[in-house]
């Protein structure tokens, strides 16, 4: 059934059919076809959205490669946004990997080759004095959520230049599909500051600014011009930083998190979903997170963000900060981070181990991952290195000496960059490891047992955070709000019946999960005085009011 309240539309004829947010295609009624000058522009038969979705699904299944399926889905999105999201709703477990990870990585690499139609805003450095005009040019005027990238660190693929736009487009599709935020309120933005990817610069089809990346003061001043323009245009917007290089990600977040409601999904979203997954995994084996010894392979902004979030959770569970930091070990390509190292990043410094604390260790070999796992008695292993195959049999077998059920989280995206496949971890641990990954993987087997692999993907968290922020009218996102999101995810995970091996609920329940996380986030925003007080009843009403469903409205004709 279409929504009961009609929409009053000033567009008609081909202009209406060319407006993705309003186009209904063959579902326009006879009255609408007459009223909006559509008679003869569409086939005679009037269809329901269910019938349209069935046809679209059959067409989708006719493609043989994931990238072709991605292109097809993006074409639907750019033609009929309601149908696009109805199709996702009906087949979310099958379609999510096609619109986001892992397929979106290929789409970013081939962005200029597969480009079809404009979506979002491309704000280039040469046009930096026109940013206010560009924001006015946006086809969506009531923007509530922006996802912005500069394309420098796309997934594990590095600098993709203008191709990075695939990430904001995909992320915002998930804000709608998982968090119920209307696509009318979502705006993807690409900051085109050049690229250092010579392959792109040499590509005759590359559509971005052909220049080496700007950096330093030039870069910071450009980003500031953008942020100030956004504040003028949409002062209450939620802005998500996405896939910025680690030397820019943390400084930008720290600089602007008190100026507007913003967060960095790579740092904070990844941390929140990782800690929520880890709490749930610990509950699965009857333990607390604070009982674990945790090692990270990869000490970039994402890994360090997760580590700091873990330390805060350990403090919530009763440890002192000093005790918690002694239980977290960061390993990069140079080995274990210690206080004897120089040239550490600012965000890495608080996470080093003191040399005095490890003076009894055997240091005849480099303190790489295997040595750290053995000597620190590690029970939880995170992979955020973006490097394939670094979780070796030796490492996994050493984990199994330390604990009966080690928790192994190879989170690097896309699947081509994962530290170990779930099947490798399951086999090497003889079915004992509890595993979750950043991208989707098939079930694993050991002997006669089958294990489902949960996807520790930010899509479990950021849509709920966004919905909670909008429902509460929050002016910022605090660490406590992120902690509440993590705890809510873990608590929710205990409510659902799960297959053997699974840590998180099936993705088909993602909308229910997002609503519950949104409620927890909104309550915490009120407690942190980042939102005005509201009764529980009114908060639930706001959440329902903000939750958009892909259904057609009846249209009425009006003038501009």
Curated annotation (Swiss-Prot):
Co-factor: note: Divalent metal cations. Prefers magnesium or manganese.
Annotated GO MF terms: malate dehydrogenase (decarboxylating) (NAD+) activity; metal ion binding; NAD binding; oxaloacetate decarboxylase activity
Binding site for a divalent metal cation: 242-243, 266
Transmembrane regions: none
Co-factor(s): Mg(2+); Mn(2+)
Enzyme active site: 100, 171
Single biological process term from Gene Ontology: malate metabolic process
Subunit structure: Homotetramer.
Descriptive protein name: NAD-dependent malic enzyme
Annotated organism of origin: Psychrobacter arcticus (strain DSM 17307 / VKM B-2377 / 273-4)
């Amino acid at each position: 059934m279409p929504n009961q309240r009609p929409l009053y539309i000033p567009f008609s004829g081909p202009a209406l059919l060319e407006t993705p947010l309003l186009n209904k295609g063959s579902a326009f009624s006879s009255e609408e076809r007459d009223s909006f000058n559509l008679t003869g522009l569409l086939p005679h038969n009037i269809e329901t959205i269910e019938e349209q979705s069935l046809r679209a699904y059959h067409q989708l299944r006719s493609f043989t490669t994931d990238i072709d399926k991605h292109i097809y889905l993006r074409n639907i999105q750019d033609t009929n946004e309601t149908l696009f999201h109805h199709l996702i709703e009906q087949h979310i477990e099958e379609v999510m990997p096609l619109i986001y990870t892992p397929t979106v990585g290929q789409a970013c690499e081939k962005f200029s080759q597969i480009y079809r139609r404009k979506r979002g805003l491309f704000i280039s450095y040469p046009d930096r004095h026109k940013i206010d005009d560009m924001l006015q040019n946006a086809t969506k005027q009531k923007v509530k959520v922006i996802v912005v990238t500069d394309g420098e660190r796309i997934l594990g693929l590095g600098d993709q230049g203008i191709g990075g736009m695939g990430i904001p487009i995909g992320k915002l599709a998930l804000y709608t599909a998982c968090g119920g935020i209307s696509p009318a309120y979502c705006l993807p933005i690409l900051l085109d500051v050049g690229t250092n990817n010579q392959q792109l610069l040499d590509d005759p089809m590359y559509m971005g600014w052909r220049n080496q990346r700007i950096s330093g003061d030039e870069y910071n001043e450009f980003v500031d011009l953008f942020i100030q323009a956004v504040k003028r245009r949409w002062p209450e917007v939620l802005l998500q930083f996405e896939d910025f290089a680690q030397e820019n990600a943390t400084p930008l977040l720290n600089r602007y998190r008190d100026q507007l409601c913003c967060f960095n999904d790579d740092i904070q979203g990844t941390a929140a979903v990782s800690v929520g997954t880890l709490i749930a995994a610990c509950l699965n084996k009857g333990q607390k997170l604070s009982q674990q010894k945790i090692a990270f392979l990869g000490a970039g902004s994402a890994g360090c963000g997760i580590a700091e979030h873990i330390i805060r959770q350990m403090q919530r569970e009763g440890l002192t900060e000093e005790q918690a930091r002694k239980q977290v070990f960061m390993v990069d390509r140079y080995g274990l981070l210690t206080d004897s190292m120089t040239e550490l990043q600012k965000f890495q410094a608080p996470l080093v181990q003191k040399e005095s604390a490890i003076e009894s260790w055997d240091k005849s070999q480099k303190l790489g991952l295997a040595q750290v796992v053995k000597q620190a008695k590690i029970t939880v292993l995170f992979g955020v290195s973006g490097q394939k195959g670094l979780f070796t049999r030796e490492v996994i077998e050493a984990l199994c000496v330390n604990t009966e059920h080690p928790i192994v989280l190879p989170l690097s995206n896309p699947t081509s960059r994962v530290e170990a496949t779930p099947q490798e971890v399951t086999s090497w641990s003889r079915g004992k490891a509890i595993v979750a990954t950043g991208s989707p993987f098939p079930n694993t087997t050991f002997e006669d047992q089958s294990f489902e692999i949960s996807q520790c993907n930010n899509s479990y968290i950021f849509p709920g955070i966004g919905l909670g922020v909008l429902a509460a009218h929050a002016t910022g996102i605090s660490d406590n709000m992120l902690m509440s999101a993590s705890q809510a995810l873990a608590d929710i995970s205990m409510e659902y019946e799960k297959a053997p091996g699974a840590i998180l609920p099936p993705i088909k329940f993602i909308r229910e999960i997002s609503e519950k996380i949104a409620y927890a986030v909104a309550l915490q925003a009120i407690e942190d005085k980042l939102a005005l007080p509201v009764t529980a009843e009114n908060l639930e009403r706001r959440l329902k009011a903000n939750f958009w469903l892909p259904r057609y409205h009846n249209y009425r004709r009006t003038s501009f």
